[in-house]
Amino acid sequence: MKQVLTWLVRGYQRFISPLLPPSCRYYPTCSTYMIQALQKHGAIKGSLMGIARILRCNPFVKGGLDPVPAFFTLRRNPHPENDLDLSDIQNLNHKLGGRHG
């Protein structure tokens, strides 16, 4: 089930997302968050976390850094610095226009 859900999100990323203007207020994007949540927490909890993230992503929130936490929660990651890996830091640095390498 986890693989099917991941495949659906990747299909969205590849075929639908490029047709829409960028709108995600968070890093990583909501679709990437969903895939990471599925991988880390399984189909049910990962789906719930991804849906909660999509509902949080709206014009009334500041957005910002919100990686998938190591524990299950439907709220924003309270300690994003603890759940970053090197690729997240490099991607964020590149997105912000800094040097990376």
UniProtKB/Swiss-Prot annotation:
| Membrane topology, from the record | Peripheral membrane protein
Entry GO CC: plasma membrane
Q: Which domain of life is it from?
A: Bacteria
Xref: InterPro entries = Membr_insert_effic_factor_YidD (IPR002696)
Keyword terms: Cell membrane, Membrane
Localisation: Cell membrane
Main localization is membrane
Tell me yes or no: is Cell membrane among this UniProt entry's keywords: yes
As for what it does, the entry says: Could be involved in insertion of integral membrane proteins into the membrane.
Output the NCBIfam families linked to this UniProt entry.
Answer: membrane protein insertion efficiency factor YidD
User: Family per UniProt?
Assistant: Belongs to the UPF0161 family.
Protein name, entry field: Putative membrane protein insertion efficiency factor
